[in-house]
Amino acid sequence: MEIRILYKAVGKPWQEASIDNTLGAMQATVGGYIETARIAKNVVVVCNEEGLIRGLPYNCRVMGTDFVGDIFVVGTKGEEFVDVPVSLEDWQRYWIGGGNGND
């Protein structure tokens, strides 16, 4: 089953995407082991757990936290990942303050 995410590759703008709701697909999306950072009750940023250790390039800041490497935003329901509950337009307007998220 696929889930809808908001994806941001290093140096690229945010985009809507879908990935398989599997650990392997999530690891492939961030290029390694995953780590989550909760930014709201039902929303997390998924990033590469070893991004800083591996010296991955800076990506962006989300809700006051800097991220390196490719990341994505997804919704949560309990312990499960679900479709991201916000549109790309609302994400850019309300969550990251407009622009392309490269700040």
List the predicted regions and their residue ranges.
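Domain-length accessory/inserted modules outside core catalytic folds
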Residues: M1-D103
